[in-house]
């Protein structure tokens, strides 16, 4: 388990002081895939560098299991860091050696014999689907393949925690998804705790079970992915989860007979509610606004429907109320 308690980091300049992290409190359980998301400058990378103590916090505490690491000596930190590994946006592979030697590198530093290191490296390259590329050089690989080698290298020392700092930002969407699926598979197979630093909500949506949203160095919201997606409370959360949510008010005024439907984990990700209304009640709704996401088989988000008359709106409201995990709000009464 990783616990951050009142963590702070201040960068001092001749002109002023920048609070990169301000009173961060988070608990990351063993086996979590924990997403940390925010816009540029939110403090994400500073936070991850504090977790592995590449950056020394200004204040607060960091517990790795039961060990508080902010006051450890460099020698003590080296022992802790063996349990924490990291992959980056830029892969950071050694270009002058092949993939096998890249994966062997941390093992050789740790004093593992060459034959044993190579056997382990081949196993890891097979795990990431690149055993046949063992003797290829990084320049001969695609970006996604290079990141797979970087992941294999990161796993060489049997870490308990994998830090991913914008690990898919430089990749195309299809390659991004394949890398995310690999990380999720590694989490399940090896039980490694994963911390994902990203500015992309689709990354959180695809693999994370929990998420914290950072803004100006502060955690403005955290919880399970389902909780945050169903009803983000902070302005930063709303902007990240549903970036076009501000359009709601502009669209509502176009109809006096409107309902706001909030999907709160409904088993309706693939259920055609509007089509069902038409077929069962002979009511044809206009979709004035929709911003929804599917996580697993569940739907989260908001939809605004407008109707031709008050009578149609009331019938639709009664019908929709019978669908589990859907909250229906009569927008025509909102201003009364």
Q: Across the structure, where does each feature detected by a protein language model lie?
A:
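Conserved signature/switch motifs of ABC ATPase nucleotide-binding domains
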Residues: 136-139, 157, 164
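Short coil-to-helix segment of the ABC ATPase nucleotide-binding domain corresponding to the Q-loop/switch region
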Residues: 97-104
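Helix N-cap at the start of a conserved alpha-helix in ABC-type nucleotide-binding domains
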Residues: 173-175
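Conserved ABC ATPase "signature" region
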Residues: 67-68, 104, 108, 115-132
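ABC ATPase "signature
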Residues: 222-223, 231
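Helix-to-loop junction immediately C-terminal to a conserved catalytic motif
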Residues: 52
